[in-house]
């Protein structure tokens, strides 16, 4: 006779009540930490206290609550609501963050630096991964640190090369800086995540199969295939949505709810489509965001445009803040391997060296193909090197390594990664403002005379055909607003887009004639 399984919840009503209570307490604590993080972030912004950025504050809140939960011996049923699950991160938290990055992107600064961005993100990340892995293996061979197998060192190099400069970019916007530097840091970080994931998964496959070196040669080819396929999927979904909203006639007052619902579903469809066929959802949803903002957005009614802009900004802010809280709490709750402190210390040193090889080497390569007045200046290279924070992506991959690596090696890598994340987010994130001042790349916070000098310095690097000082609208009180105005001015005047967009794409995919700027702003 077939045995009928009865779940504990059905068998024990009292247990069901306790589980519901634990869920309520866990979710309540999460909401309280979110509220506290947003209030703290508002206070920090209002008082212009850049030594503790919002992301750092959220991480600290998670760490403190996690430590208190450990000390107070919180019930396991409540703790389970705070365990960082990489599947939850990749499927629910990451997509809105990446889509908002593409949706809010000013495309012309991004695409005018696209060659440099791809160089840093693909070649640079590959170089940084190999250099980090090689140095870690060499350090182990010289008995300076715990020795890991070579492939596992490369896995560590791949996951720790995933940058997450959310903190740096927020400070860039607050204090104001060069639009090209902002585009380089932003673009490199987004595409770098896809490269790091691809490298990590490939090395994990090599480690499981313990096979020949042919897989190492296939890493680059596989990434290019993944990148091209993911970009094509994202662009295809974006163009499909543009045609749908152009010809479906949804921009009427009684269909705004349907219009907004469909618009919100397309990004997630793009992400899941790419992940479902073995491509990169990150790259796919990024380009979906770029295409939907430029072509689909203008096909919406004004009310729907206002709603979807606010909605994606809201969801992205919630996901971003929750990720850092989630990560901080889990760091405090997880078991760590502190018996190999040397591995942690040397890893911090090695990723700094690898980041330098990545940035300065790729910048040299990019400058070889640029005119003298368009070369990346050294102060921008230094800022780019300093902006290589590690965050949620590296943490999620390190958490995955606990399952991928046996014999406690994953625990060592996880402990080293969490330490690096905390150190870079708190120390580097908190000192970014001073770094920008020291490198003299601060823009809108300076006085008028220095601002004019900054405008002149822009002509040393992809000279923008605009003059910030010539505007009569500089009475705005917020430096962040002035920075956004500068981005918008750059977006409207630069000539990086070809006539193809104006004469063919915009008229075909939108209700616009293509005679305007087509910003969709």
UniProtKB/Swiss-Prot annotation:
Record GO cellular component, one term? Golgi cisterna membrane
Question: Topological domains (Cytoplasmic): residue ranges?
Answer: 1-23, 70-86, 108-115, 244-271, 332-340, 403-411
Q: What induces it?
A: Induced by NaCl in a ABA-independent manner.
Q: What is its main location?
A: membrane
Keyword annotations for this protein, in alphabetical order, are:
Antiport, Endosome, Glycoprotein, Golgi apparatus, Ion transport, Membrane, Potassium, Potassium transport, Sodium, Sodium transport, Transmembrane, Transmembrane helix, Transport
Intramembrane region positions read 87-107, 142-162, 166-186
Know the name of this protein? Sodium/hydrogen exchanger 5
Organism, by scientific name, is: Arabidopsis thaliana
What lineage does UniProt assign to this protein's organism? Eukaryota, Viridiplantae, Streptophyta, Embryophyta, Tracheophyta
């Amino acid at each position: 006779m077939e045995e009928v399984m009865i779940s504990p919840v059905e068998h024990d009503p009292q247990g069901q009540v306790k589980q519901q209570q634990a869920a309520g307490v866990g979710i309540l604590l999460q909401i309280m930490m979110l509220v506290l993080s947003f209030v703290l972030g508002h206070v920090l912004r209002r008082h212009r206290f850049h030594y503790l950025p919002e992301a750092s504050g959220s991480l600290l809140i998670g760490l403190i609550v996690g430590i208190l939960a450990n000390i107070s011996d919180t019930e396991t049923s409540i703790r389970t609501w705070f365990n960082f699950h990489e599947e939850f991160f990749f499927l629910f938290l990451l997509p809105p963050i990446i889509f908002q990055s593409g949706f809010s992107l000013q495309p012309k600064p991004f695409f005018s630096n696209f060659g440099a961005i791809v160089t840093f993100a693909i070649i640079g990340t590959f170089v940084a991964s190999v250099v980090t892995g090689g140095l870690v293996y060499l350090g182990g061979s010289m008995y300076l640190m715990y020795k890991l197998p070579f492939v596992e060192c490369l896995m560590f190099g791949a996951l720790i090369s995933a940058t997450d400069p959310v903190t740096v970019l927020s400070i860039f916007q607050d204090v104001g800086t060069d639009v090209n530097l902002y585009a380089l840091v932003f673009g490199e970080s987004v595409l770098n995540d896809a490269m790091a994931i691809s490298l990590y998964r490939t090395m994990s496959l090599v480690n499981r199969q313990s096979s020949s070196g042919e897989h190492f040669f296939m890493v680059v080819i596989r990434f290019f295939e993944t990148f091209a396929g993911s970009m094509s999927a994202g662009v295809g979904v974006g163009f499909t949505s543009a045609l749908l909203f152009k010809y479906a006639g949804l921009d009427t007052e009684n269909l705004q709810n349907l219009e907004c619902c469909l618009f919100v579903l397309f990004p997630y469809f793009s992400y899941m489509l790419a992940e479902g066929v073995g491509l990169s959802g990150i790259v796919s949803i990024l380009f979906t965001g770029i295409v939907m903002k430029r072509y689909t957005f203008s096909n919406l009614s004004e009310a729907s445009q206002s709603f979807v802009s606010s909605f994606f900004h809201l969801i992205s802010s919630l996901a971003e803040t929750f990720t850092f809280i989630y990560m901080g709490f889990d760091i405090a709750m997880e078991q760590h391997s502190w018996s190999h402190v040397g591995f942690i210390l040397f890893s911090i040193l090695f990723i700094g060296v690898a980041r330098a090889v990545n940035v300065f080497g790729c910048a040299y390569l990019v400058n070889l193909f640029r005119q003298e007045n368009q070369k990346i200046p050294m102060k921008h290279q230094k800022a780019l090197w300093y902006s290589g924070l590690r965050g949620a992506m590296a943490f999620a991959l390190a958490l995955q390594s606990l399952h991928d690596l046996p014999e406690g090696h994953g625990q060592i890598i996880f402990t080293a990664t969490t330490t690096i994340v905390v150190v870079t987010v708190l120390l580097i994130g908190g000192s970014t403002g001073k770094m920008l001042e020291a490198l003299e790349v601060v823009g809108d916070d300076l006085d008028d005379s220095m601002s004019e000098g900054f405008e002149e310095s822009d002509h040393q690097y992809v000279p923008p055909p605009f003059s910030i000082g010539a505007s009569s609208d500089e009475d705005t009180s917020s430096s962040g607003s002035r920075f956004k105005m500068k981005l918008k001015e750059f977006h409207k005047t630069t000539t990086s887009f070809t006539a193809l967009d104006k004469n063919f794409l915009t008229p075909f995919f939108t209700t616009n004639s293509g005679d305007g700027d087509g910003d969709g702003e």
